[in-house]
């Protein structure tokens, strides 16, 4: 394949189209396939050759693909993205014309994946040259992916196995990757709704479902819907292929903070296994209600947590640390009427800076409001009066 002529290549394409062999055709238009390294296919003007062998719109599609190969070989990713856009647009013409059949879905997967990758590379190239903003090309790519999504979603006439709706989840996952990259998470909402209401929801491949759950779980975490985040991220982690250590680690980066906010602390064994020891001191601090250690741990690994986009989520663990510290005070004093001074002493012991009795009242009022403490503040007696039954409810019942 690395040394075939342009005519041999186009003949293979024509045979794949004639036999409706979507997988073979997808290979012949994929940048993961070795043909893209073949210098004999890097033509400046391949249109005439393509028109001699292929029918429209495939002639236009594969001419654009060959121009894209040429641009990519010259590391001109802006030009490559332009031609990859043409590839997808030409493909859509034929895809829409294929009524009640979906053999071309593998082609769509291949070319839309490459479109997103080229858009990302083009973005970086333009930003480096000072000619564009981060995400400009990805945003345009998302619009083209949405055109593909609409074609798939509107296929209501085909039989279940022949439906183009099988392509919806792949496209949604590609769009999620773009929206997370350009920080436009609100655009995920209608896509999530479309998949949740689809009767294909449980039929998609496990790999696609894992990716979907991972992104929806992350979005739920940013929306502070921690129970949904735990459910979706746990599904992704449990069903991710056991050999995919890297992917499992990536899921854990978001699952761990969610679990901790719900009161489930990770074991050191788990953190060591997935090389996530950055969480070890955070876990210890929250479990002990040690605010001093928590602040130090967050500061020490700040760069890692910010890069992963979880620093602000981990900051929410401070309120859990207050809850755990104040629970220790309650267990120590063994009374349901607790002097506010006792909490002030505990906070000063933890070196919480410039804390006074007013701030203690404010922290406790917040904990009561959030459901972390069952009780009330008696301002007259300067005491916290807690419930005799379960005054510090389990975190999983609160968040």
Curated annotation (Swiss-Prot):
Q: Which GO terms describe its biological process?
A: poly(A)+ mRNA export from nucleus; post-transcriptional tethering of RNA polymerase II gene DNA at nuclear periphery; transcription elongation by RNA polymerase II
Task: Identify the residues that the record assigns to the PCI domain, covering every copy.
Answer: 210-391
The domain of life is: Eukaryota
Q: Which Gene3D superfamilies match?
A: Winged helix-like DNA-binding domain superfamily/Winged helix DNA-binding domain
Kindly state one GO CC term assigned in the UniProt record: transcription export complex 2
Q: Which Pfam families match?
A: PCI
Give the GO molecular function terms. Answer: double-stranded DNA binding; RNA binding
| TM stretches of this protein | none
PANTHER family in the record, alphabetically?
PCI DOMAIN-CONTAINING PROTEIN 2, UNCHARACTERIZED PROTEASOME COMPONENT REGION PCI-CONTAINING
Q: Which family does it belong to?
A: Belongs to the CSN12 family.
Q: What is this protein called?
A: PCI domain-containing protein 2
Organism per entry: Xenopus laevis
Q: What is the lineage of its organism?
A: Eukaryota, Metazoa, Chordata, Craniata, Vertebrata
Record gene name: pcid2
């Amino acid at each position: 394949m690395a040394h075939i002529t342009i005519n041999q290549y186009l003949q293979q394409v024509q045979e794949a189209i004639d036999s409706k062999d979507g997988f073979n055709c997808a290979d012949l238009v994929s940048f993961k396939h070795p043909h893209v390294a073949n210098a004999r296919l890097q033509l400046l003007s391949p249109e005439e050759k393509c028109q001699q062998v292929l029918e429209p719109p495939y002639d236009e599609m594969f001419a654009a693909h060959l121009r894209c190969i040429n641009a990519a070989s010259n590391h001109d990713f802006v030009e490559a993205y332009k031609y990859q856009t043409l590839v997808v647009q030409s493909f859509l013409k034929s895809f829409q014309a294929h009524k009640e059949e979906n053999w071309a879905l593998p082609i769509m997967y291949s070319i839309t994946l490459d479109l997103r990758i080229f858009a990302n590379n083009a973005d970086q190239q333009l930003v480096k040259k000072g000619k564009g903003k981060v995400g400009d090309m990805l945003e345009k790519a998302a619009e083209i992916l949405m055109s593909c999504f609409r074609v798939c979603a509107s296929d209501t006439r085909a039989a279940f196995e022949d439906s183009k709706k099988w392509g919806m989840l792949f496209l949604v996952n590609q769009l999620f990757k773009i929206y997370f990259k350009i920080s436009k998470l609100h655009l995920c909402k209608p896509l999530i709704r479309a998949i949740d209401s689809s009767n294909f929801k449980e039929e998609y491949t496990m790999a696609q479902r894992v990716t979907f759950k991972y992104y929806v779980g992350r979005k739920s975490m940013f929306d502070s819907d921690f129970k949904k985040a735990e459910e979706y991220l746990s599904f992704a982690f449990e069903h991710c292929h056991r050999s995919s250590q890297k992917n499992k680690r990536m899921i854990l980066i978001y699952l761990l903070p969610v679990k901790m906010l719900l009161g489930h602390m990770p074991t050191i064994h788990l953190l060591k296994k997935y090389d996530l020891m950055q969480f070890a001191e955070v876990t210890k601090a929250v479990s002990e209600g040690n605010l001093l250690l928590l602040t130090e741990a967050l500061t020490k690994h700040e760069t890692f947590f910010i890069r992963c986009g979880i620093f602000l989520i981990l900051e929410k663990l401070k309120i859990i640390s207050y809850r755990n510290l104040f629970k220790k005070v309650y267990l120590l004093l063994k009374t349901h009427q607790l002097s506010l001074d006792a909490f002030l002493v505990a906070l000063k012991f933890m070196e919480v800076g410039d804390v006074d009795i007013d701030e203690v009242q404010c922290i406790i009022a917040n904990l009561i409001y959030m459901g972390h403490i069952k009780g009330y503040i008696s301002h007259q007696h300067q005491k916290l009066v807690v419930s005799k039954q379960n005054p510090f409810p389990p975190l999983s019942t609160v968040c």
